Design a protein with these regions (language model features):
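Signature of alpha-helical transmembrane segments in polytopic membrane proteins
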Residues: 1-126, 458
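N-terminal hydrophobic signal-anchor/signal peptide
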Residues: 1-16, 64, 118-282
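A short, structured surface patch at a secondary-structure boundary
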Residues: 339-402, 444-448, 452
Length: 458
């Protein structure tokens, strides 16, 4: 399945690069701009286009759909990656010609990219072969993975049947879906052949008998992919499947993955990234701080007690964006309004400051002190940690690593406080915990910065 998704992504990526380069090349030639800047401009536009479209999540095939939001994000991205070449040519090209070049390049690029996506969507949902999936089991694990496959139509997969020898609590769900249920394990080979099964997912909680395992080995032909349910769940959601058994395996993965070299490299990366971010944004922070100070005379920077790695408390630095207030969320006051930029307590000019996450840049001080990391699970209030730890199973596991300024959960889900959302955020955090590596973390940081500047991070 990874190969199938990768082929689709590669094909779309290559077409995008061709469309961007062609649009830039044609516009440049059409308006007769200086020859010496021709090739550099086309190359720069193409490279920036690749980066921006990736950061705009244009290559998430498993979630691909045609929506107004996607139209907007693509158009916004096309404008973004053409700004830099426009700015570089500003002093060397007649202004009217440059404006016309910029407008025509945006128009041609957007039309080409949108047309390809429309055709890809049409092909995906009308001509691409649907892969039949057989799920071994009918318990809660089977229900969860079946729902994910049914809801993610862009996967082009269909649950063709369940194999089980036990009628459990989710047996009714299986029947309600109208999906065949096979109760005789020894019909496996016949069902795979008859239903043309391409993927088998093992979704049973209990330990399978040796006799049944041997029968599956004999019955499942070559070419049929076999996945454990948690592994398949991670592949199609980017989240960790949380259960008592999976947490045990996560513990072993985490313990065996610990490395002094990784920790040292990550620390160097944290220090370098935090220093660069602080240096680049210092003039902006100074301006915001002065304006906040002039608003009501209160401090520009304040601290909050947060919980970090292994439950250790520390003082986290933040740029104040609200009027002086000792407000802190209590157990009965947790609501989405806690982080709402339209809250009346927010200083008016600080609404964008919060939206772009400039108020969180002072956390670079915590990173330089070693209390936080650039990438990791979001740090939380002490009171909220107590509540979530009591109400959400395995919540403390996310504190096995340093909390982060940004993270996998933040760029995929954003900020949340409701328990159902926190449970989902935990899945993202544990996925990061299992798969963390330095190159991936650099990508998360780049995407987080881009989303923050777009006003969409968190």
């Amino acid at each position: 399945m990874r190969r199938i998704i990768s082929r689709s992504v590669i094909l779309m990526f290559l077409f995008d690069m061709l469309a961007i380069a062609s649009a830039s090349y044609f516009s440049y030639r059409y308006f007769g701009l200086p020859q010496r800047f021709h090739i550099p401009t086309v190359l720069l536009t193409t490279v920036l286009g690749a980066i921006v479209l990736y950061l705009k999540s244009q290559y998430k095939i498993r979630e691909f759909n045609v929506t107004k939001r996607n139209y907007y994000l693509l158009f916004e991205g096309v404008i973004f990656f053409n700004i830099v070449p426009f700015a570089l040519l500003f002093f060397f090209v007649p202004k009217m010609s440059l404006v016309c070049y910029y407008a025509l390049t945006i128009l041609l690029t957007y039309v080409a990219l949108e047309l390809y996506r429309f055709l890809f969507h049409f092909y995906l949902f009308n001509f691409k072969k649907v892969k039949n999936v057989l799920i071994i089991g009918s318990d809660n694990n089977a229900k969860i993975i079946a729902e994910e496959i049914i809801n993610k139509k862009a996967l082009r997969m269909k649950v063709a049947g369940f194999f089980t020898d036990v009628e459990d609590e989710n047996y009714q769900f299986v029947e309600d879906c109208g999906i065949p249920i096979y109760l005789n394990p020894y019909d496996l080979a016949k069902v795979i052949r008859k239903q043309r099964i391409s993927v088998v997912i093992i979704a049973v909680k209990r330990r399978m008998e040796e006799q049944w395992l041997t029968h599956m080995v004999r019955s499942i032909p070559e070419g049929v992919k076999v996945y454990k349910m948690p592994e398949f769940y991670e592949m199609i959601t980017g989240k960790y499947f949380v259960s008592k058994m999976s947490i045990n395996w996560l513990f072993y993965d985490y313990m065996n993955k610990r490395s002094m070299l990784y920790d040292a490299c990550k620390r160097i990366y944290d220090v370098i990234a935090a220093t660069i971010i602080l240096t680049v944004t210092f003039p902006i922070l100074l301006y915001i701080g002065i304006r906040v100070k002039m608003t009501d005379g209160g401090p520009a920077i304040y601290t909050q007690t947060r919980v970090g790695k292994n439950g250790k408390k520390f003082k986290m630095y933040k740029l104040r964006t609200m009027y002086i207030n000792d407000y802190k969320p209590k157990a009965g006051e947790i609501s989405e309004n806690t982080a709402n930029v339209n809250d009346d307590r927010v200083i008016p000019f600080c609404k964008f400051v919060r939206k772009a996450r400039f108020d969180e840049i002072p956390q670079m001080i915590n990173i330089l002190k070693g209390e936080m990391s650039i990438v990791g699970p979001r740090t939380e209030w002490e009171d909220l940690v107590k509540i979530y730890s009591e109400e959400i199973s395995y919540y403390p596991c996310r504190m096995w690593v340093k909390t982060g300024w940004t993270g996998w959960a933040q760029i995929n889900q954003g900020h949340c406080v409701m328990n159902d959302d926190i449970s989902e955020k935990l899945q993202y955090d544990l996925y990061y915990l299992k798969h963390r590596n330095l190159f991936w973390e650099i990508g998360i940081l780049v995407k987080a910065v881009f989303l923050a500047l777009s006003g969409r991070h968190g």
